């Protein structure tokens, strides 16, 4: 981190001099003077930083270099300020507790800024209800919002400059960004989640995504912080300006709102870039599947947040001889190569995973990954220096006590959970014991199957293969899932989530579907097969009918066979499903094929009715005709059941 002076408003008044001297979110880092200045940045990046300095008026500017020394200083400063707490049970692991109001993505305050509303979102719902596929803000309203929030918002704090790469810097699919922020927690997390360092600075030119973030709590404070966590929740704004490749975030320190390389850049901005440039930026995991014979295939899978992407990407298969390797657990950038193969990279270099439910039983590889160099946020704390959350099956010694994510004593049986349902771990990807040897390959890996999925407690079979590309795009557009804790929606409500991108579209969702349809028309494309899975079917007593976790390898093995052209499927009105006996259920007592593949006419009649209503309400005239034709085809097949 290089020391820069000038252009910043000094802090004055309010807090004690001692508090200011100690740093308050890392101000103390400014005492280390290094030789390099903003001259290390190209002119466009310098202009961006200087613009942010004039607007936000920070105390000083610090250019991040990604060094180990820099990381240690950030950790020391955050520990001194009470933001991070060491976890001595593990190696270089830390706990952060946020303000209880700052715990998830804020979809209602996340906007796309375009001159024309139709560029960002489909027509407003005819019913007058809230839009489901994104929020639009006019350029004039955006400028007013910036002027209401940002002038002087970093007073008394340092402004950190983070040049970063999404994807291996040498990859033809890599994209660069520069984030400025007043949060050292964000700097530490971005060092894990993206590629930061000299290799990025060497490649940085005028073509980069501009990311401005502030927690919105200038010094001196006018009211005390909660959990030493700065945020200003009432005027939160997460804005994306696709035409300028710019992201502006204010008021939240939570990762989904502040780590701007993640959903903001890698999905919202990148999906618009992908549409313009002929590739795909998707909310998908990437994994490699190796059969007992040694043949390997790569698959991508789109699930809504907290629906099992990380567990699937890091799965330990229950089938002997099968192996899984992880390329990425959340985001895939995919582009056809000159031979027509769809190649994918993971643009991230870390995991920002949901902690609750993660255990040595459900995901032993994740547990191994997070045992060192990890930042935990809003998990419970054990008196032996370990962490705790619902579903963690680690034994504890007698006498060990617990502190909840709210900093209060907690015991088993208490009505409130010890860890927040959306508590997170942030860990380097290369610590995962099953990372694929090609996970960092600049050329990417070839994708042979794309899988859609969500939480559907009834009616939707365990696995279905699309009849073809167009039908598969329809399946992706028709995805529905129970809401999770990853956003501010209440869990349990069944929500439409096309392609698991509902919160992440970077442009009009109808045109997004058109882009997917046109992808299938490429003359030389070797298109992946498309599937839909549902691990979450329940019986009439509410019990899961599929054991999930490592047994999901049985479904992947069937998909593997379909990629090879095996005749193991039978047609149904909704797609191809495994023939009875062709999905390996050996050693699963009580698992009933008929329960895994329900085909109820009444359910699908209602599903079609609700889907037609949803399309009309949320896509309107922007729904591609081919998608409506697929719905009409499904309705006709269901009528004949």
UniProtKB/Swiss-Prot annotation:
PROSITE patterns: PEPCK_GTP (PS00505). Monomer. It comes from Gallus gallus. Keywords: Decarboxylase, Gluconeogenesis, GTP-binding, Lyase, Manganese, Metal-binding, Mitochondrion, Nucleotide-binding, Transit peptide. Its EC number is 4.1.1.32. Phosphoenolpyruvate binds at residues 105, 256, 422, 424. Present in liver and kidney. PANTHER family: PHOSPHOENOLPYRUVATE CARBOXYKINASE, PHOSPHOENOLPYRUVATE CARBOXYKINASE [GTP], MITOCHONDRIAL. SUPFAM superfamilies: PEP carboxykinase N-terminal domain, PEP carboxykinase-like. Gene3D superfamilies: 3.90.228.20, Phosphoenolpyruvate Carboxykinase, domain 1, Phosphoenolpyruvate Carboxykinase, domain 2. This is Phosphoenolpyruvate carboxykinase [GTP], mitochondrial.
């Amino acid at each position: 981190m290089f020391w820069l002076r000038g252009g910043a408003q000094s802090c004055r008044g309010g807090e004690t001099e001692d508090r200011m001297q100690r740093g308050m979110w890392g101000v103390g880092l400014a005492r280390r003077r290094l030789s390099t200045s903003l001259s290390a940045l190209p002119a466009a990046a310098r202009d961006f930083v200087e613009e942010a300095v004039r607007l936000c008026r920070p105390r000083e500017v610090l250019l991040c270099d990604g060094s180990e020394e820099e990381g240690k200083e950030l950790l020391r400063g955050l520990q001194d300020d009470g933001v991070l707490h060491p976890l001595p049970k593990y190696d270089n692991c830390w706990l952060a507790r946020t303000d209880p109001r700052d715990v998830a993505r804020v979809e209602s305050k996340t906007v796309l800024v375009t001159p024309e509303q139709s560029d960002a979102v489909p027509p407003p719902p005819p019913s007058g209800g809230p839009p489901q596929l994104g929020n639009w803000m006019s350029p004039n309203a955006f400028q007013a919002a910036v002027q209401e929030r940002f002038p002087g918002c970093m007073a008394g704090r340092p402004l950190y400059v983070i040049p970063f790469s999404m994807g291996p810097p040498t990859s033809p699919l890599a994209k660069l960004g520069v984030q400025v922020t007043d949060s050292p927690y964000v700097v530490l997390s971005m060092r894990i989640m993206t590629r930061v360092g000299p290799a990025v600075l060497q490649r940085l030119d005028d073509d980069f995504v501009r990311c401005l973030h502030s927690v919105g709590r200038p010094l001196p404070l006018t009211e005390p912080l909660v959990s030493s966590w700065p945020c200003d929740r009432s005027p939160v704004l997460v804005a994306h300006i696709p035409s300028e490749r710019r992201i502006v975030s204010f008021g939240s320190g939570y990762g989904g709102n502040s780590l701007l390389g993640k959903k903001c850049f890698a999905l919202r901005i990148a999906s618009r870039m992908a549409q313009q440039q002929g590739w795909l930026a998707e909310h998908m995991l990437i994994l490699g599947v190796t059969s007992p014979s040694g043949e390997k295939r790569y698959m991508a899978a789109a699930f809504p947040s907290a629906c099992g992407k990380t567990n699937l990407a890091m799965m330990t298969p229950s089938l002997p001889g099968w192996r899984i390797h992880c390329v990425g657990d959340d985001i895939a950038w995919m582009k056809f190569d000159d031979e027509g193969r769809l190649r994918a990279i993971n643009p991230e270099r870390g995991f920002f995973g949901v902690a609750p439910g993660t255990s040595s039983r459900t995901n032993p590889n994740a547990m191994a990954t997070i045992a060192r160099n990890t930042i935990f946020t809003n998990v419970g704390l054990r008196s032996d220096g370990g962490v705790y959350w619902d579903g963690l099956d680690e034994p504890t010694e007698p006498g060990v006590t617990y502190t909840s994510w709210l900093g209060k004593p907690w015991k088993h049986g208490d009505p409130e959970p010890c860890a927040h349902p959306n508590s997170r771990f942030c860990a380097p990807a290369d610590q995962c014991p099953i990372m694929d040897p090609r996970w960092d390959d600049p050329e990417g890996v070839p994708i042979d199957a794309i899988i859609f999925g969500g939480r559907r407690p009834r009616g939707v079979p365990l696995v279905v293969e699309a009849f073809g590309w167009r039908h598969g795009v329809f399946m992706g557009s028709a995805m529905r899932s129970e809401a999770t804790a990853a956003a501010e929606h209440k869990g349990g409500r069944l929500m439409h989530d096309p392609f698991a991108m509902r919160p992440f579209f970077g442009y009009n969702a109808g045109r997004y579907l058109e882009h997917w349809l046109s992808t299938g028309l490429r003359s030389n494309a070797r298109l992946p097969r498309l599937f839909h899975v549902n691990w979450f079917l329940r019986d009439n007593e509410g019990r899961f009918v599929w054991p999930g976790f490592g047994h999901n390898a049985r479904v992947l093995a069937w998909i593997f066979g379909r990629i090879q052209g095996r005749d193991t499927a039978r047609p149904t009105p909704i797609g191809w499903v495994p023939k009875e006996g062709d999905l390996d259920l050996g050693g699963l007592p009580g698992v009933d094929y008929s329960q895994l593949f329900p085909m109820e006419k009444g359910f699908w009649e209602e599903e079609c009715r609700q889907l037609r209503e949803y399309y009309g309400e949320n896509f309107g005239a922007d729904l591609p005709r081919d998608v409506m034709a697929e719905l009409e085809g499904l309705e006709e097949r269901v009528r004949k059941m």
